[in-house]
Structures are given as structure tokens and as C-alpha cells.
């Protein structure tokens, strides 16, 4: 039996959360994770360069037949866990139901606050500042048919400071929460999958 869970990371942009996983892997902190594949929904996503530099198989899939091609790739590479890391496409309920408790997303707020339809990227941080909350953070959760509605795996809080702009807050949430939380959550789920194999 394999002592690794094979992981695919789905990206649409610069790949900062992908890089956090790559860095933790290189540091030996993810002993049950094999990063087998990076898939981008955008041709020029910076995350593809990060995968290239790390020697990880990477591919761009265009809009046409995206999910069918993705499913074929995941099966070909025997993927156990799918990680959404700055991935901006909405996956269909048919796709999500194929991989119960195997798709992981990181969201830049403490769910159930500032989540769901329309809350992504900078908009999440704008909403937190507009509302006047004193604490925000990040959540890693399983993906189900409800946007940001799956079971929570881990959360980390981040203080909001006087003078924060959405951009400053976004950066702090990434550095203090997302980049720490996501790799640890992927390792946790991977270890559970390996343990279930016996």
C-alpha cells in the first residue's frame, strides 16, 4: 500500500497557495502528500511557472469540455485529493459528487462569514472592512454542492488593524492564515486517506 495520497492542485492565477504547499513539501512537513499534478483554467497563470520550477506535471485545460478533461486527468494520475487554490471556476454538482470529501478549498474568511456566491478574492476583504469586524481569517473546507458550504477542516483567525485596506488585509490573511492552513489541512486529509488504506 502507498504511504502517500496523490494530490492535484487546481489554479487560475499566480499560485501563491500552490507555492505554500510546494515549500512545505520541500521542508519535509507533508509526509503523506505526493503532489502529482497542477491544472490551470488559465493559459498564462503564474502558478504554472511555479509548478514547472518545482518539477511538477502541469497542464492548462481550456473552457471547452473542462470537467470531462479534468476527470480524465484525475483518473489517469490516480488522484486522491483535489485542492482548489485560487481556482476561479465553479465546479458542477456532478463533478463534486464524484469526489466526496476529496475536494478541498481555501476561502479567505472565517466561514460562515463573508462566504458563498459572490464572495471571492478582494471582495471578501472589502466586505469584512465594510462590516467593521475586528477579526477575519481563512477557512479550509471540503467542497460540496453549496458554495463554501462543505465541512470545515481548519480555520485560522487574523486580526484586522486600523488603516487596513482590502489589499493589505488580503496579503495578511494569505501570509498569516492561508499559506499555513492549507498545506497542514492537505497533510491531515492525506494522512487520513493513507490510514484508511491500512
Where are these regions (language model features)?
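One-carbon transfer enzymes
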Residues: 1-198
Amino acid at each position: 500500500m502507498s504511504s502517500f495520497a496523490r494530490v492535484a492542485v487546481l489554479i487560475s492565477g499566480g499560485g501563491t497557495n500552490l507555492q505554500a504547499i510546494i515549500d512545505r513539501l520541500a521542508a519535509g512537513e507533508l509526509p503523506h502528500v505526493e503532489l502529482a499534478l497542477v491544472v490551470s483554467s488559465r493559459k498564462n497563470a503564474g502558478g504554472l511557472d511555479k509548478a514547472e520550477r518545482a518539477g511538477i506535471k502541469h497542464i492548462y485545460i481550456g473552457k471547452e469540455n473542462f470537467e470531462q478533461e479534468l476527470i480524465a486527468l484525475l483518473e489517469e494520475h490516480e488522484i486522491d485529493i483535489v485542492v482548489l487554490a485560487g481556482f476561479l471556476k465553479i465546479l458542477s454538482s456532478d463533478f463534486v459528487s464524484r469526489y466526496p470529501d476529496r475536494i478541498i478549498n481555501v476561502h479567505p474568511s472565517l466561514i460562515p462569514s463573508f462566504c458563498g456566491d459572490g464572495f471571492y478574492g478582494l471582495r471578501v476583504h472589502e466586505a469584512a472592512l465594510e462590516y467593521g469586524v475586528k477579526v477575519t481569517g481563512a477557512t479550509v473546507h471540503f467542497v460540496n454542492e453549496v458554495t463554501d458550504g462543505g465541512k470545515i477542516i481548519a480555520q485560522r483567525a487574523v486580526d484586522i488593524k486600523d488603516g487596513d485596506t482590502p489589499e493589505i488585509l488580503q496579503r495578511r490573511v494569505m501570509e498569516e492564515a492561508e499559506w499555513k492552513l492549507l498545506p497542514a489541512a492537505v497533510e491531515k486529509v492525506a494522512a487520513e486517506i493513507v490510514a484508511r488504506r491500512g
